[in-house]
Every structure is written in structure tokens, then in C-alpha cells.
Amino acid sequence: MDIKSALSRIVGQLDLTTEEMRDVMRQIMTGQCTEAQIGAFLMGMRMKSESIDEIVGAVSVMRELADKVELKSLDGVVDIVGTGGDGANIFNVSTASSFVLAAAGCTVAKHGNRAVSGKSGSADLLEAAGIYLNLTPTQVARCIDSLGIGFMFAQSHHSAMKHAAGPRRDLGLRTLFNMLGPLTNPAGVKHQVVGVFAQTLCRPLAEVLQRLGSKHVLVVHSKDGLDEFSLAAPTFVAELKNGEITEYWVEPEDLGMKSQSLHGLAVENPQASLELIRDALGRRKTENGQKAAEMIVLNAGAALYAADHAMTLAQGVELAHDVLHTGLAWEKLQELGAFTAVFKVENEA
């Protein structure tokens, strides 16, 4: 199906099949569509609301066209990632949590990008921390194999996205592509915590990942609007495990945590996020640093559970708490910086 035919269907509020969506996405991602057509398609999809079949089709094409990171094994390899767009401008919780996971012995293939609507994307934070981002897929794999953690800079692995960049920027609205990033990890991880910007997306995206072969995934949105587990409110979870999806609410107290305000956790730029994370993972001398540490523990604990490194969410949180207080997570971040610095010299020689 070509994009003009797809537009006619969408205007009539009719869904595309998975294969039809694959056809259209392939045209978009290979430069066969005009920017006007892409903008109209994205806007039409948003107004109609994307079906599970359509999201599956779009994700499968993005995965096919990605510059993949080949790992020796995907057993237990985990990613913790969010769609962004929650408007809270909280520090980079998922990225900080990734280093707790690695320090706990998990293998982490972290996928992320620069900020679009927020103040600090995962790539912005890591760059501020002195971590070199422009790695080849082979170099990322070496990071993961050697350190237990590597970062896949989305724009380096999804170069075909450039064809949709202009229309997305001009629209200035959340579109289908905001959902695709967390679902298109270039290493092909089967274990994830995926934060989303609306509770209504939790079940559908869990179903998408179920159809695409994921093993253990938590798709989450908190009642106070975050695309991650919150200390200040219950969090809704759609969990895919053993081929089945269950939905439930989690209170911080259910996991041995104390409910508290998120005041003091918003940041204005990547450097501020880094300073808060340094405090949380290291010194914890400030009230906000302690609160940030607890936010990291909550989310890292969920990812330890998704990675099957813990038997329950509560056990994952307990393990994350123990690991964070060793200081090993901050050391792991510094190790990644030193390791990638060698690749920077190689690539710029």
C-alpha cells in the first residue's frame, strides 16, 4: 500500500493492517514520501489513534532498518527507557538507574536520545558526564561485553529517522514516533521497563511487545503523570511475563518505600541532572540527593525484576537499595566514560 492510499483510509477512520503499515513505514523511512505526506500521515494517525497492528508494523520496520548491536546472548539483557513527554522535567531517572543495574550484575543495553520536549535527555546527560556517544555498533557491544553496560545513541542507530525529522519538528506534537523509540532497542532486548506518557498506552504497548517476542516487560505510567515509577503517587503497570499480560497498581509502600513529594527533583539542564545523580549515587549529602536516590532505587528495582535478576518487584527494590549504597553505580558510570574515551581517540584519529 502506498502512502496516498493509506491517507485515504485514515481520513475515513479506518485502521491499516500490520502489512499495510509496514509498507507505508518502509516508504517513509527510505525517503520515498514528501514531508507534506509524512506530516499528514502522522497527524491522521494521531487523530484516528494508532492500533496495535499499526504499531507492530511500524516497530518491525524500524527494527529491520536499525544499525543493530550484536551481543553474544540476550539472556537477561535489559533496558529501562521512557517515551518522555510527561512535562515533569525530572532528572534522568532511567539513565541513572541503568548504572545501578550494571553494578548489580545485570547486563544493560541502554537506548536513548537527546531531549525533545524535556530539559535533559539520556544522551545529553551522558555527554555532560564525559561519556563519548558516537560509537559504532561493534564498540557499543564491546562496552556491554566488558562493563555490563553500553549506550546506544538513537540517532546513530536509526539513521532512517532523518526522513521524518522535519515533519515531526514542524508539527510540534506527540506522534507515533514518540512511542517507537522505546520499542526499537538496537540490541533487540527482550527484558524492559518502558515508561509511557499516558496510562492508556500501557496495555497496548505491552501487547505490541508480546507480539514482537519480548519475554518480561513492565510498561508503566504513574498517577501523577510520570513515564516511570513515582515516589509521590501510585504507578499503573502492564506486565508481560510468561506470555501473559497482567495489569495492576503499585504504591511506593507496597515496595518498602515511603511516599513523598517530588519537589526538588526537576532540573533545568543536563548538568543539573548530573549533579543530582552524582549526589544520589555517591555522597547523598543533600535532601534532594537522598530523594533522588530513592527514586532511582524504585525504578532500578523494577528493572532488576524485569531482567529476572529478582523474583519480585519488592525484592528488586531491596537489591537496588543495597547496590546503590555501595557507591559502585557511580564507579560504573566513570568506567563507561573512561572506556568510551578510548573509542573517541580511535574514531577521531
Swiss-Prot record:
Residues annotated as binding 5-phospho-alpha-D-ribose 1-diphosphate: 82, 85-86, 92-95, 110-118, 122
Binding site for Mg(2+) 1: S94, E228
Pathway noted in the entry: Amino-acid biosynthesis; L-tryptophan biosynthesis; L-tryptophan from chorismate: step 2/5
Cited InterPro entries: Anthranilate_Pribosyl_Tfrase, Glycosyl_Trfase_fam3, Glycosyl_Trfase_fam3_N_dom, Glycosyl_Trfase_fam3_N_dom_sf, Nuc_phospho_transferase
The enzyme's E.C. designation: 2.4.2.18
UniProt: anthranilate 2 binding residues: R168
Taxonomic placement: Bacteria, Pseudomonadati, Pseudomonadota, Gammaproteobacteria, Pseudomonadales
Subunit composition and interactions: Homodimer.
Residues holding Mg(2+) 2: D227, E228
Any one Gene Ontology BP term: L-tryptophan biosynthetic process
Disulphide linkage map: none
Organism: Pseudomonas putida
Annotated signal sequence range: none
Keyword field contains Amino-acid biosynthesis: yes
Name the record gives this protein: Anthranilate phosphoribosyltransferase
